[in-house]
Amino acid sequence: MKTKKSKSTLWFWLIILLAIIVTIIIIAVTVKGTTQVISDATFADWMSKSPQIDPNADKYWKNVIIYYGSNNTVVVKGSYFLESTGKYVNFVAYLTQKRFETIMADKPYPWPALVYQGSVGMALLVSLAPLLIYVLLFGGIIWFMMKSSSGAGAGAGNIFGMGKNRARAEKSDVKFANVAGIEEEKSELVELVDYLKFPAKYAEAGARAPKGVLMEGPPGTGKTLLAKAVAGEAGVSFFSIAGSEFEEMFVGVGASRVREMFNDAKKSAPAIIFIDEIDAVGRKRNNGMGSGGNEQTLNQLLVEMDGFGTNSGIIVMAATNRADVLDPALLRPGRFDRVIQVSLPDIKERKAILELHAKGKKIDGSVDWYRVAERTPGFSGAQLENVLNEAAILMVREKRDIITITEIDEAIDRVVGGPAKKSRAMTKQDKDIVSYHESGHALIGLKLDSASKVQKVTIIPRGNAGGYTIMTPKDETVFSSKKDLFATIAGYLGGRAAEEIMFGKENVTTGAHDDLDKATNIARRMVVQFGMSSLGMTKFLTMAEESYGKMEGTYSDETAARIDAEISKILEESYKIALKIIKENMETLELLAESLRVLETITAEQIEYINVNKKLPEEVLEQKNRMAKEDEKIKKGEIIDIKVEDLDID
């Protein structure tokens, strides 16, 4: 029994074949109607004239073919240029073989003639050869488009596969055991697995299973992995598609794809439909007139999720980074009954994720995963996986047998700032500036109770940064107080403050531009979002969407000026705090800067040693002695044989 899909494909090819036949008939009739039958005398006259003008030219004769017809008849067909009309005329001449030989008289043909000793059908085939070539070329293009569309999962129901469902059923082999660090989110989804396995139990209790689950969170937190784990645990079909795949250049295609996707899921029920980046298709509908393709697609999705039809056994899961831009009709109960926040992992969750991804890798048993988790605040699960992958690559590059904390530490730096640029030339002045700048950041972290803890300081360039300081929160809390935010801003401004104190206000460099950007962003949020300024407990929206998609500000120019003044006030107060701390701890600043100049990178343990003992660590003193001896040899003109493996390079 033929399916609806195969029938539509058959009709498509029948229409194409009919169009080709009609085209051939029209061309044949047109050619036949304009062809003149000439006598042997006319043919002889044309043959006697054209060679006299230019026997080697192909000006007068075109597309001439000669073939043998019935009863020893010679048929000559082609086009001849008439000087009287200035145009070519299509002709056909029927000659006896003897008459043809008399006219030609053993002369060379004045045209590139084609002689066929065969049937009339063969000659007709040759005459239609150019047309057949075009037909085959056209058919090949159609076949290629059909093949491509079908291979891409678009189906072959129409010429481009538009409107066809791009999601295909697959069985997921991911389990909850493959997902680490988001235990609360997993517990929310256990009920879905139970419903998909035992739907009758919920029906007897009169309970309705959630029709949809929306997962919101930053990129790389495991939203897609969770959806696959639900399908894998339940053992049901898993349909996945990106929100952008619904749309095409033609209006209505997205709605058609939504319908077919749900129809396919019904055939495979129980099933899960997962829509990644649903904000691409589920954005809020504006108040403007008209109904574009996006709105049609959204409307169809709303109907399929909770309309007149029934989609029993189908659960829609979706992921987005921007739930705030989704249409309210999409978020109501009955469509997405549950909205799960998948946030960035905390320190314990990061430790669990690292341990999960460490399986199957050769890692030194002395690696403390809790310490590694401390160094990676704000990292997503995807970034943590990338850290261990980079560490494995470094192990192979360095031709080592196991991954040590050295490779992991370097991998974290590579993920944060990119590969180190040790070959970048840096003058002594630049090195001094960067050393004091980064020491300023570290000093604020050491002396301010609310500031972040310093984990590492380096002056080795990475990316666009001449150096950087890694600081992590002392305690990973959910909320931040006004005091905490002031301390964070002071930490960002500590580098600029150190430059001003050491080199003067007029010699402050551009190295603090990124610090200023981050500090200003926090200060602005304190004013316009958190109500932490003299403007009071008011949230100022910078832009608002009005009717017909028009965007307008929500406050006056006078208020904007007051907001800018408050931001400047917060930055100035934080900068004064940074200046005060650095001036009171100049000895520690000098020791930190000297350690950076010598080692280029100092760890949390070395920083704490300097802060407590007010002297340089042993590693710094040893390196200074080696450098002094080498300088002495250079002054004496001695040749120094330095091997790469002898250099103290991290």
From Swiss-Prot:
It is a multi-pass membrane protein. GO terms for molecular function: ATP binding; ATP hydrolysis activity; ATP-dependent peptidase activity; metalloendopeptidase activity; zinc ion binding. Zn(2+) binds at residues 437, 441, 515. Its EC number is 3.4.24.-. The active site is at 438. Its cofactor is Zn(2+). Residues 1-10, 145-650 are cytoplasmic. Residues 32-123 are extracellular. GO terms for biological process: protein catabolic process; proteolysis. SMART domains: AAA (SM00382). NCBIfam families: FtsH_fam (TIGR01241). In the central section; belongs to the AAA ATPase family. This is ATP-dependent zinc metalloprotease FtsH.
